[in-house]
């Protein structure tokens, strides 16, 4: 919560700050709050009406599907199977760097993810640069 909301939400703080203002200013603030609250209520009402309209349309379309002999669940499974067949795994990235690990084995690294400790230490100690490890 930001500072303004903390102040507005605390009655004691409001009382302290209200002592510094005239009654006319407080009444102006009240009127502005009423306007904002009414606008917010209208927005909320509009959103609820849109949700209700959408529910009515969904019910209507469901009844139309059933009248045509189509099970709505069957329709959902058909669309889900299309989406899953469109998904493809991305190919494995080729290695860009090679290095010898602590056990003396040759290893490769794609350049993605954490830098292997052998490469990282060599760069930090300024013994080598990253380009020295290129394949």
Curated annotation (Swiss-Prot):
InterPro entries: H-NS-like_N, H-NS_C_dom, H-NS_C_dom_sf, Histone_HNS, Histone_HNS_N
Subunit structure: Homodimer that oligomerizes on DNA into higher-order complexes that form bridges between disparate regions of DNA compacting it.
Gene3D superfamilies, alphabetized: H-NS histone-like proteins, Histone-like protein H-NS, C-terminal domain
GO cellular component: cytosol; nucleoid; protein-DNA complex
The protein's name: DNA-binding protein H-NS homolog
The protein's role, per its UniProt record: A DNA-binding protein implicated in transcriptional repression and chromosome organization and compaction. Binds nucleation sites in AT-rich DNA and bridges them, forming higher-order nucleoprotein complexes and condensing the chromosome. A subset of genes are repressed by H-NS in association with other proteins.
Gene: hns
Keyword DNA-binding: yes
């Amino acid at each position: 919560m930001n500072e303004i909301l903390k102040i507005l939400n605390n009655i004691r703080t409001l009382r302290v700050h209200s002592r510094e203002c005239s009654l006319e200013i407080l009444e102006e603030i009240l009127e502005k709050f009423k306007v904002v609250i009414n606008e917010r209520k209208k927005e909320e009402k509009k959103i609820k009406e849109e949700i209700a309209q959408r529910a009515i349309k969904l019910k209507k379309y469901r009844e139309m599907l059933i009248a045509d002999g189509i099970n709505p669940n069957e329709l959902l499974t058909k669309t889900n199977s299309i989406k899953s067949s469109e998904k493809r795994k991305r190919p494995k990235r080729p290695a860009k760097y090679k290095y010898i690990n602590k056990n003396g084995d040759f290893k490769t690294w794609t350049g993605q993810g954490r830098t292997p400790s052998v490469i990282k230490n060599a760069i930090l100690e300024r013994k080598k640069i990253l380009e020295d490890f290129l394949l």
